[in-house]
Amino acid sequence: MFMPDTRNWRGPHPKDLECFAPRWVPVLQAAVADLSWLLGRGYSSRASLKLVGDRYSLRDRQRKALQRCAASDDACLERRAKRLSPSDLEDRTVVVDGYNVLLTLEAALSGGLLLLARDGVMRDLSAMSAHYRRLRATLPAIELLAEFFASARCSQIIWYLDRPVSNSGRLKRLIQEIVAGR
């Protein structure tokens, strides 16, 4: 079994207190509105992010948050139309983007910054690389997910883990062990 990393990679970032201090909230909200407006009119996301980020003098981490939170009105409507409540999952097969869900939950459990995006989805600022590191929050995160899916009475859960990411096989076995124990 691979040992948990003692560092909280997906926990609070040293720059978060400054980058997301209360004085920045209205600035970031205005930036999200501007970027969303540009995206809704078909402008390039990369060029629009640079334009809006420069206009508001945003730092790299703030730009990353802006990119994760902004969405056109149409994209928001499409995503909200696909949203399901836990009761909708009963007797259904659920497909889980394993790293995406797990990293966000690990960030939350590690005290990392979570953002409520314009489409109503919670997002974190964790980045996935070619190497996955198990954290102290990994086991509790998987247990919470297993508990949620069990309470939602899903008929089957299919986890997708990117094969090129190192430790995917170990993470798969850990998930299987936890789910089998329920």
Name every feature range the model reports, one short phrase each.
Residues 1-94, 101-182:
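Charge-biased, low-complexity intrinsically disordered regions
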